[in-house]
Amino acid sequence: MYSCNVLDEQYAGAMAEHGFVPEPDNRRYGSMGLCWRQAGPGGSGYFWTYGQQDLYMLKIHDFYFHEDQLLEFCWPESLSVTWYESISGEEFSPCRRLVSGCVKSFIGGREPYRALIHRRVPIVSIGIEITPAYYQDYLRRQFSEEFQSLLESFQSLDQTCLLYTSDAADD
């Protein structure tokens, strides 16, 4: 049985604002986690989250919007890394294109997240969001001698994109 935690609560307002409703009995992505369904007229699909206490959250995006959507919200302090199989849009800070085939990192808690998501392009991704309770406290206790700053590692990651060409597809 799924139980709500602090990490789920951070998404509730943003999800409701964009027409998503929680479906705690939806097992689309398994019995653990919370599935959200895009129930409004603005789009279709699902968003799934699974949080482990106040340590981390796994996320699956599998939805699209009928019209361009401006997303703007204050992301809590965290480190996020996400693989985008499909997406189209722009992030405003930092200014980067959102394109398919990218691994992107984001450091939350600094400034509001702002992005324009293009209409009718599915957002299909999987990611993990790691909280300070995990990357500053838990990892340091578990690996005190080997511990290196995960924050510094994320700052250097930024984004990595795979560019698909017709030549690569023929191999």
Where are these regions (language model features)?
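Conserved small/polar residues in nucleotide/adenosyl-binding loops
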Residues: 164-171
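Membrane-cytosol interface segments
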Residues: 1-57, 64
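N-terminal regulatory/effector-sensing and dimerization cores
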Residues: 35-160
